[in-house]
C-alpha cells in the first residue's frame, strides 16, 4: 500500500446484461484521511444517471463494510455536487457539515479542493 492508503475494494456497476454503468469503491478502516475523503466513492456514466444506481451500490457496500466489522462510514461530496448530496440524503446519512480540508490534504494539494460536505452512516 502507498503511504497513508488503506485496503479498498473497487467494483464496476453493471446491469443484468453486464453493461458497465459506472464504478464504486469501498475503503476499509478509519483515519483522518478517510474522514475527509470518505469510505465510499462512486460514479455513474451520464446516460444511466437518475435511476438510483449509486444508492443501490452504496447499500451493497454498506453490507460489505459490516463484514469488516465497520460500525460507521463517511461519504464525502463536493458541497456543490447536488446529485451526490441528494444520494446521501436518500440513504439517510447524517449531514455533519461542510468542513475545510487541511492544508496538507491530498485533495487540497492535487485537486485544488478546499471543502467537503461530510455525511455519516451508522451501519
What are these regions (language model features)?
Residues 1-35:
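Acetyl-CoA-dependent GNAT
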Residues 8-12, 23, 41, 74, ...:
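Short hydrophobic/aromatic beta-strand element in the GNAT-like acyltransferase core
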Residues 23, 35-46:
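Conserved acetyl-CoA binding element of GNAT-fold acetyltransferases
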Residues 42-44, 50-67, 86-90:
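Conserved acetyl-CoA-binding loop-helix of GNAT-fold acetyltransferases
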Residues 65-76:
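Conserved GNAT acetyl-CoA-binding A-motif
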Residues 76, 94-111:
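Conserved catalytic-core motifs of GNAT/GCN5-like acyltransferases
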Residues 80-97:
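Conserved active-site alpha-helix within GNAT-family acetyltransferase domains
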Residues 114-122:
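Ser/Thr-rich low-complexity repeats and stalk/linker segments
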Amino acid at each position: 500500500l502507498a503511504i497513508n492508503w488503506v485496503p479498498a475494494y473497487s467494483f464496476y456497476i453493471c446491469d443484468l446484461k453486464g453493461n458497465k454503468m459506472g464504478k464504486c469503491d469501498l475503503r476499509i478502516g478509519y483515519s483522518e484521511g478517510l474522514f475527509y475523503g470518505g469510505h465510499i466513492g462512486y460514479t455513474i456514466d451520464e446516460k444511466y444517471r437518475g435511476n438510483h444506481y449509486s444508492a443501490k451500490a452504496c447499500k451493497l457496500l454498506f453490507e460489505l463494510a459490516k463484514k469488516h466489522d465497520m460500525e460507521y462510514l463517511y461519504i464525502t461530496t463536493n458541497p456543490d455536487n447536488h446529485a451526490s448530496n441528494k444520494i446521501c440524503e436518500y440513504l439517510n446519512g447524517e449531514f455533519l457539515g461542510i468542513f475545510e480540508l487541511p492544508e496538507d490534504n491530498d485533495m487540497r494539494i492535487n485537486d485544488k479542493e478546499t471543502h467537503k460536505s461530510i455525511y455519516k452512516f451508522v451501519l
